[in-house]
């Protein structure tokens, strides 16, 4: 397996870390649990609502690894009833029996990275699966016992037409997942696409894809609740909702990120060393980096997350999640957004915030108003 040319996430080729043809599962599990022990004070007295197992293709680890990991997590953490526990999966490495064990271990939601069903686009994206494997991955997930599945699908791909984008989306809808993450390709720094930019669709085509695609999703019962997220029967991604509502989370593992709010109002982010070898070797100077969120940056940090969600929220949520009074700068920015038609006037009169349809379309311009 190799890294995809558009991916800026913390993924590394597995063959670089294999010993005698095997991943260093025992060593990695031991380091994960030591990492968790160090972060336990941050979650003391809290119920864990969700977990997300991501980073490349975590399903490459064995069934035994996940039985041991989940047993340890249940022992060390206090879990809410019906907690959502998601694993990312790659259609090109899908084994039904293995995923049946993952389900028995306690993982109850899958996020399958399909991205496209079309051979030419899959090749451009560096994906190792094909159309049939993508379809079979969903079928095998159901057979393994998963009743909560997300499909990741991309649009705005190199040389992609409106018809091609809708063909991909239509097939994804036919597979009837509970959740569809349908997001536009963005060229990120430190990726192959950034170094050698492909030819992307023109803006008019991108707008057409977005409009027609969202209409198709709505027609088939998928409600858009976030910029790129759509769910059926309110099966929204609880883990991501916590991110976007500015909730707290800990991150364990190589490259994992966390956000913690202390009772004194201090808010900081953590990130663990990205490279698995450094992580396994427990190098103290790179294992954990803590970065405080400065008070003047809080309005942007908060709104940058909350405004991704297409839901109304109370202005007092700012105080509840930041332990700070609503600053005048935030009020002023909201008033400017109201004048520009980016926020809803009726909700604002009730001290609530909601983006208008124009605000959804021009989200970047809306967020710029909250820059310090």
Regions from the PLM with identified roles:
Residues 2-3, 11:
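Short pre-active-site segment immediately N-terminal to redox-active cysteine/selenocysteine motifs
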Residues 8-42, 46-324:
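C-terminal scaffold of the Radical SAM
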Residues 89, 355-356:
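Hydrophobic residues in beta-strands and at strand termini
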Residues 230, 347-352:
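Short, Lys/Arg-rich nucleic-acid/phosphate-binding segment
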Residues 315-316, 328, 346:
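Extended hydrophobic-aromatic, low-complexity segments
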Residues 324-338:
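Short amphipathic alpha-helical interaction segments
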Residues 339-348:
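A short, conserved structural fragment
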Residues 358-372:
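Short, amphipathic alpha-helical interaction segments positioned at domain boundaries
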């Amino acid at each position: 397996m190799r890294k995809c040319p558009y991916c800026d996430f913390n993924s590394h080729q597995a063959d670089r870390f294999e010993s005698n043809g095997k991943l260093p599962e025992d060593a990695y599990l031991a380091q994960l649990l030591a990492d968790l022990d160090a972060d336990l004070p941050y979650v003391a007295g809290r119920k864990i609502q969700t977990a997300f197992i991501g980073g490349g293709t975590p399903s490459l680890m064995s069934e035994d690894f996940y039985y041991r990991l989940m047993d340890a997590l249940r022992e060390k953490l206090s879990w809410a009833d019906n907690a959502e526990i998601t694993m990312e999966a790659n259609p090109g490495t899908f084994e039904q029996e293995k995923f049946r064990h993952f389900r028995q271990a306690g993982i109850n939601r899958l996020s399958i990275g399909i991205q496209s069903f079309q051979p030419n686009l899959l090749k451009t994206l560096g994906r190792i699966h094909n159309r049939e494997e993508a379809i079979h991955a969903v079928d095998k997930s159901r057979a393994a016992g998963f009743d909560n599945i997300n499909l990741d699908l991309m649009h705005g791909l190199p040389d992609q037409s409106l018809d091609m984008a809708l063909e991909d989306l239509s097939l994804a809808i036919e597979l009837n997942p509970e959740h569809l993450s349908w997001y536009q390709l963005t060229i990120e720094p430190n990726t192959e696409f950034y170094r050698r930019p492909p030819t992307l669709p023109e803006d008019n085509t991108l707008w057409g894809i977005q409009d027609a695609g969202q209409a198709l999703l709505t027609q088939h019962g998928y409600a858009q609740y976030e910029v790129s997220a759509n769910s059926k029967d309110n099966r929204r991604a609880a883990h991501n909702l916590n991110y976007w509502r500015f909730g707290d989370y800990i991150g364990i593992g190589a490259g994992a990120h966390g956000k913690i709010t202390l009772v004194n109002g201090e808010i900081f982010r953590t990130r663990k060393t990205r490279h698995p070898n450094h992580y396994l070797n427990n190098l103290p100077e790179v294992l954990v980096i803590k970065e405080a969120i400065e008070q003047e940056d809080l309005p942007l940090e908060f709104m940058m997350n909350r405004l991704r969600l297409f839901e109304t929220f109370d202005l007092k949520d700012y105080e509840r999640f930041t332990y700070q009074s609503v600053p005048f700068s935030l009020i002023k920015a909201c008033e400017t957004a109201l004048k520009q038609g980016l926020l809803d006037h009726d909700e604002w009169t009730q001290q609530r915030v909601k983006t208008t349809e124009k605000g959804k379309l021009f989200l970047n311009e809306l967020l710029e108003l909250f820059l310090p």
